[in-house]
A protein has these predicted regions:
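Conserved catalytic-core motifs of GNAT/GCN5-like acyltransferases
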Residues: 72, 77, 119-122, 134, ...
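Conserved acetyl-CoA-binding loop-helix of GNAT-fold acetyltransferases
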Residues: 95-108, 127-135
Length: 164
């Protein structure tokens, strides 16, 4: 598979939501406990602009197989040069380098959108994601112990970061 990405659009939302929703049962990736609707993702999509907070998708044979979003951190002007990254890969396409590809592209693109600090918020038990971000130069910047409860189990949230 030749890796390329493009800007995500409204017509991509069903597949973006499908990939996201498929991660919910694992209780490793998101704090959402129920599937999200396509309609509920429209305001989220509208927060993403190619110039400041891109949303990218990777396609294979016309089907979205991974996506990455840059999101504003904490919504205050002083944090405008900081962005949170979220990466989601279709279950059938994991372990093929898509997450690494998207993160590398995000790191390289950050200066063009005036971002110099990238963050990830990852559950402490999500070892694959922690390892992925670690391989790409992200360090553990903080931990919020037992801030999430998933199926009666308290989970830590790890904050990873990297300057670019």
């Amino acid at each position: 598979m030749q890796l390329r990405h493009r800007t995500g659009t409204r017509r991509d939302l069903p597949q973006i939501a499908e990939i996201y929703n498929a991660t919910i049962p694992s209780r490793m990736v998101t704090a959402d406990t129920e599937p999200v609707s396509v309609e509920s993702r429209i305001p989220w999509l509208e927060e993403h602009t190619p110039e400041r907070r891109p949303l990218w998708v990777v396609e294979d044979a016309g089907r979205i197989v991974a996506w990455l979003s840059f999101s504003s951190f904490y919504g205050r002007p002083a944090y405008r040069k900081t962005a949170e990254l979220s990466v989601y890969v279709h279950e059938g396409f994991r372990k093929r380098g898509l997450g690494s590809y998207l993160l590398r592209q995000a790191i390289g693109h950050a200066p063009a959108i005036k971002v110099d600090t990238l963050l990830g918020f990852i559950f402490g038990h999500n070892e694959p994601s922690l390892a992925l971000f670690g391989r790409l130069g992200f360090s553990r910047w903080g931990e919020l112990p037992k801030v999430a409860e998933l199926d009666g189990i308290e989970r830590d949230l790890v904050i990873v970061g990297r300057r670019v």
